[in-house]
Amino acid sequence: MGGSSYDVLRKQARSLENEIDLKLVAFSKIGAGSGGGGSGGLGGVDTSPLLGEHVFDSLSEEIEQMLEKLSSLNESMSDLPASGAAAMHTLQRHREILQGYRQEFNKICANHTMRIEREELLRGSGLATSSGSPSISGLNRREMYLKESGHLNSASHLVNDQINIAIETRDHLHAQRQAFKRLQTRFNDISNRFPLISSLIQRINIKKRRDSLILGAVIGFCVILLLLYAFN
């Protein structure tokens, strides 16, 4: 009886896993905005985003209930007496599948939330026109992303221009720094030359004094000779 109950629960779990798998595929498409009630056959234009959100929310609740049911089935199987290593392996596999489904479900919900916030941000920044509709007002997502890409490109060009200005300013400052270095070198050379000039002038003055002394001595000697000659 226990084995029969286990087989029934296992079949129910497999059937529910298949249903959840299909639901997650549809849920992912609706969350990405590429399917569901958000398209009205007008070339990809979102004509009824509120309906798409309603479908997403409804499917989200349905998948949550299915995941809870699958978790309950797994718990029921684990409560049955162990019937071998194969059964334990199968139960572990069902738990891993459930965990994978939960992760995928949370990932889809998070991506959908980010997409909605992104569209709200674009709408608030003026990338989408406002005509009273809660949608993106006639602009499909491709047009909206193209406009956003244009704004990003403009911002990128502006940043590049600012970077070029900064580089030119840096080069100009570097050139000024080199000019100041050259001036400083010249001043140092001049200051180093002044002691040499001063020393040269001092030597010239010493030589003049020495020549004056020699000339004075010669003149004095000549005067003495003349006086001696005159008195004799």
Swiss-Prot record:
Lipid metabolism listed as a keyword: no
Domain of life assignment: Eukaryota
Cytoplasmic side of membrane: 1-211
Main location group: Golgi
InterPro entries recorded: Golgi_SNAP_su1
Transmembrane annotation, as ranges: 212-232
GO CC annotations on file: cis-Golgi network; Golgi medial cisterna; Golgi membrane; Golgi trans cisterna; membrane; SNARE complex
Keywords noted in UniProt: Coiled coil, ER-Golgi transport, Golgi apparatus, Membrane, Protein transport, Transmembrane, Transmembrane helix, Transport
Molecular-function GO terms, alphabetical: SNAP receptor activity
Annotated membrane topology: Single-pass type IV membrane protein
Compartments where found: Golgi apparatus membrane
GO-annotated biological processes: endoplasmic reticulum to Golgi vesicle-mediated transport; Golgi vesicle transport; inter-Golgi cisterna vesicle-mediated transport; intra-Golgi vesicle-mediated transport; protein transport; vesicle fusion
Coiled-coil annotated residue ranges, if any: 6-23, 52-80
Chain's role: Involved in transport from the ER to the Golgi apparatus as well as in intra-Golgi transport. It belongs to a super-family of proteins called t-SNAREs or soluble NSF (N-ethylmaleimide-sensitive factor) attachment protein receptor.
Subunit structure: Component of several multiprotein Golgi SNARE complexes.
Family as reported in the entry's similarity comment: Belongs to the GOSR1 family.
This protein's name: Golgi SNAP receptor complex member 1
Native source species: Drosophila melanogaster (Fruit fly)
Encoding gene (name): Gos28
